[in-house]
Amino acid sequence: MILVDKFVTHVISESSFEEMDRIYLTNRVLARVGEGVLEVETNLDKLIDLKDQLVEEAVRLETIEDSQTAREILGTELMDLVTPCPSQVNRDFWEAYAYSPEQAIEDFYQLSQKNDYIKLKAIAKNIAYRVPSDYGELEITINLSKPEKDPKEIAAAKLVQASNYPQCQLCLENEGYHGRVNHPARTNHRIIRFEMVGQEWGFQYSPYAYFNEHCIFLDGQHRPMAISRQSFERLLAIVEQFPGYFAGSNADLPIVGGSILTHDHYQGGRHVFPMELAPLQKTFRFAGFEQVKAGIIKWPMSVLRLTSDSKEDLINLADKIFQEWRQYSDSSVQILAETDGTPHHTITPIARKRDGQFELDLVLRDNQTSAEHPDGIYHPHKDVQHIKKENIGLIEVMGLAILPPRLKEEVEQVASYLVGEAVTVADYHQEWADQLKSQHPDLTDKEKALAIVKDSVGAIFVRVLEDAGVYKQTEQGQAAFMRFVEQVGISLD
């Protein structure tokens, strides 16, 4: 069948266009791809595959240049044909929400996959596996989904005149944005508007999802990330308004924060993270908040879990803990609230509903540096940075490692080294590879070697999280943790 005809047939069946629109749609496609595609045939069946073939034909016809950016821009323009306009998407969402919030969310999720905003084909390239640990099973992913720019595009991006539009990748102005070499194409992007604590916010999915239904809740205004009482109010409002989803925030300080600190936002989704399954290892009640169940969970980072029927009680207690942590120091365990007025303490908060109750996990963070640990005292230390050196953000805090693409080949290379097929590994992996070889000197089976290396990556990720934990998993560390809890105020009843 002719490629353009087949694509247009799919567009008509997947959108509000009708058969009468066929000629119009064909001309829309030809204007973007080139009339030389008219005779091209296809044996593909899926809409996104047909779109990809049209993009490659546009490159062949020299309608667009042979670059990742040009491909992305054309691809999103073609998929915009199956995407209703923003007002219609919002109208459909809220009409469905009135009958079933779950159905409204599901419909928007399906649209975001159907129109290739969520890059399912790219996400499928990621490597993902689980590893056992003292803290339960952890999740390891090697992130291969994001396409890497080639050197020509990187050079071109440096020459592009600076633009403040959109101000960042999370601004509402991204909806329908054409794209350029240093800003992603978002023609097929749609955002659900909703009111939260008296302000307009947006709800969208993450194009390169790290977990099931990975979504972003973003401030309608371009305002910097800030953890405050409002953060707890908003997170609990989200889990109430979007049933089945958790919601969490990155911390708001360098080193312990996420990659985007310039635009206030939260992340969420329908995924049970390892941290959610972590049991309480110590329980108590805070004075004045006796109705709130509280405790420290068994986790490599320092986490207080609060559970209650009352959102108001949770918000008030979380804010009290946060305010106390911001000014709390304990020199006996290298915890310092500030240096010369520069704050070191913040929180990574996560909210969910469980068994009808609201739950908040408060992860204590400290971004101090030292001569011994210039990248951060509570950051992956030098000896584990060959696996993970980036900030430990919200997703990793919860037990899902997001590791760089280089590790795919490097893990295989270390496995080859263990069985004698390779004589060298990357310099920064040499010590690790030699250590594994000394532990397994007689390995000959490549598959077994690969399993050993992958398990070792998991064990190193545990160390990464332990490095980021402010109170260590030692008698001294846990006693210090309880001193902070007592400072907040424990109920003696």
Swiss-Prot record:
It is found in: Cytoplasm. HAMAP family: GalP_UDP_trans. It is an enzyme of class 2 (transferase). It catalyses: alpha-D-galactose 1-phosphate + UDP-alpha-D-glucose = alpha-D-glucose 1-phosphate + UDP-alpha-D-galactose. Its EC number is 2.7.7.12. The keyword Ribonucleoprotein does not apply. Keywords: Carbohydrate metabolism, Cytoplasm, Galactose metabolism, Nucleotidyltransferase, Transferase. Its main location: cytoplasm. It holds the Pfam family GalP_UDP_transf. This is Galactose-1-phosphate uridylyltransferase. Coiled coil: none annotated. It comes from Streptococcus pneumoniae (strain Hungary19A-6). The keyword Nucleotidyltransferase applies. Belongs to the galactose-1-phosphate uridylyltransferase type 2 family. One of its GO terms (cellular component) is cytoplasm. GO terms for biological process: galactose metabolic process. It comes from the Bacteria. The lineage of its organism: Bacteria, Bacillati, Bacillota, Bacilli, Lactobacillales. The gene is galT. GO terms for molecular function: UDP-glucose:hexose-1-phosphate uridylyltransferase activity. Pathway: Carbohydrate metabolism; galactose metabolism.
